[in-house]
Amino acid sequence: MAIYELRTYTVTVGKMNDVIELYKTLGWPALSKHPNKLCSYFTGDIGALNQIIHLWKFDDEADRRAFWNGVFSDPEFMNFAKQLRPLLQNQENKLMLGAPWGPQV
């Protein structure tokens, strides 16, 4: 059964444009070298603001761990992460399973 990982990064107020530029120039190029497990990235428009939200889909927990182990061993991604961390206030991860009804991502 597929596992979904919802990651929510709360950005320091006034730093969203810096985070977006960092993702465009360093983050996404580094991530795109790895298997495509990303469903989508989102930013908030109403409700909680200053957040980058991303949804990932993995075959199972072993697939998830293998993916992140590969990403975290990538020097280009780790350079991006080093620059991203000071711009964030909080990081939250949720692991979810698809409901047994309705559409699946």
Language model features with spans:
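Short amphipathic alpha-helical segments
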Residues: 15-40, 71-72
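Short, flexible helix/strand-to-coil boundary loops that buttress conserved ligand/catalytic motifs
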Residues: 23, 68, 81
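Short cationic/low-complexity microdomains
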Residues: 66-77
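Glycine-rich beta-strand-turn "strand-cap" elements at beta-sheet edges
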Residues: 1-2, 33-53, 59, 78-105
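Hydrophobic pocket/interface hotspot
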Residues: 7, 19, 31, 54, ...
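Short glycine-/aliphatic-rich beta-strand segments at the starts of folded cytosolic domains
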Residues: 3-9
